[in-house]
Design a protein with these regions (language model features):
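Active-site catalytic pocket residues across diverse enzymes, especially alpha/beta-hydrolases
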Residues: 67-70, 94, 171-174
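Short amphipathic alpha-helix with an adjacent loop that forms part of the alpha/beta core around
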Residues: 39-44, 125-128, 168-173, 255
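Active-site neighborhood of phospho(di)ester-bond hydrolases with catalytic His/Asp-centered motifs
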Residues: 30-33, 48-58, 81-83, 156-161, ...
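Active-site metal-binding motif and surrounding structural segment of the metallo-beta-lactamase
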Residues: 36-82, 177-178
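Metallo-beta-lactamase
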Residues: 85-143, 240-254
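Conserved beta-strand hairpin/beta-sheet module of binuclear metal-dependent hydrolase folds
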Residues: 1-43, 144-159
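Divalent metal-coordination and catalytic microenvironments
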Residues: 3, 22, 30-31, 54, ...
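Cap/insert and terminal regions of metallo-dependent hydrolase folds
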Residues: 164-254
Length: 255
C-alpha cells in the first residue's frame, strides 16, 4: 500500500497547511480535508472510497467539492464509509440542500454520485487485498481511527482523539505495525483546553505513547499552524526514545 499525505494540519494558513486527508494508492481517501483540492481532475476521478473519521468540517469539507467536480465523470458512485452518527451528521448538516446538494439522489436516486456504507469500531473492510480496520477514538463527536493493513505491514491513524486506552489494547495486538500517525492538536500551555476538546497536547501524548508496547515509526499530525514549532519543541523534549516526527504534506508511506 502507498499512502500520500494530502493534508495534515489542524487548520489553514500558508502554502503548506492543508487539513486532514490521505490518499491511499489511487482509489481511497482517509478523510477529505482541504488537501484534496490539490489533486488533479484525473486523480480525483480514480477515487472510489472515502473513509471518514468523524464529522468535523476540517475532515469532510472536500467531499462536497470533490463530488461536484467529478461525479459526472465517473461510472459509479463514490462510497463514503462512516459510523451511523457521522453519516447522520453529513446528511443533516452538509448534504441537506441548504448547504450543498444531496448527491445520494443526483443525478437520480437509482444512479447517484454518492452512497454511504455504515461502519463501526471493529469493522474490517477488504478492498482488493487491502484490509482497513475501524479503531476506537474518543472525541467531542463520535469518531474512529483506522488501521491500514497491506498484508506485509500496517499503518495506524488515530484520527482526532483524546486519551484512549481502548485504542492501545487494539494497536498492541497488531503484529505487523510499522507506522503510527497520532494527533497532537495543542501545546502544553493549552493542556486544559486539549482535555476539554478531547485532543492531545505533548504531555498527554507522552502518557498515551507510554501505553504503546510495539515498535513503530511515529508521526505527529493535526498541529495548529501558529504553534507548530512550539508544540514540536515540547514533543522533542519529552523523555524516552520514541522521537516522534512531524507529519508533512506529500510525505509518502509505503508498506
Amino acid at each position: 500500500m502507498r499512502l500520500r499525505v494530502l493534508g495534515c494540519s489542524g487548520s489553514i494558513g500558508g502554502q503548506q497547511n492543508r487539513t486532514t486527508s490521505f490518499l491511499v494508492d489511487q482509489d481511497i481517501l482517509i478523510d477529505a480535508g482541504t488537501g484534496v483540492g490539490d489533486l488533479s481532475l484525473a486523480e480525483l476521478t480514480l477515487i472510489d472510497h472515502i473513509f471518514v473519521t468523524h464529522s468535523h468540517l476540517d475532515h469532510v469539507n472536500s467531499i462536497a467539492f470533490f463530488l461536484d467536480s467529478v461525479g459526472a465523470l465517473r461510472p459509479k458512485p463514490v462510497t463514503v464509509y462512516a459510523t451511523r452518527p457521522t453519516i447522520g451528521a453529513l446528511k443533516r448538516n452538509l448534504f441537506n440542500w441548504d448547504i450543498w446538494p444531496d448527491f445520494t439522489v443526483i443525478p437520480t436516486p437509482e444512479q447517484p454520485w454518492l452512497r454511504y456504507e455504515e461502519i463501526e469500531v471493529g469493522s474490517v473492510i477488504a478492498l482488493n487485498g487491502r484490509r482497513i480496520t475501524v479503531l476506537p477514538a474518543i472525541h467531542t463527536v463520535p469518531a474512529v481511527g483506522y488501521q491500514l493493513d497491506s498484508g506485509k505491514a500496517s499503518l495506524v491513524f488515530t484520527g482526532d482523539t483524546g486519551p484512549n486506552d481502548a485504542l492501545w489494547s487494539v494497536v498492541n495486538r497488531i503484529e505487523n505495525l510499522k507506522f503510527l500517525i497520532i494527533e497532537t492538536a495543542f501545546s502544553d500551555k493549552d493542556r486544559e483546553l486539549a482535555k476539554l476538546a478531547l485532543h492531545l497536547c505533548p504531555s498527554m501524548l507522552a502518557d498515551e505513547l507510554a501505553k504503546l508496547t510495539r515498535p513503530a515509526e511515529i508521526y505527529i499530525t493535526h498541529l495548529k499552524p501558529s504553534e507548530i514549532e512550539l508544540t514540536m519543541q515540547e514533543i522533542d523534549e519529552l523523555p524516552g526514545d520514541l522521537r516522534p516526527r512531524p507529519l508533512q504534506n506529500n510525505h509518502v508511506f509505503e508498506f
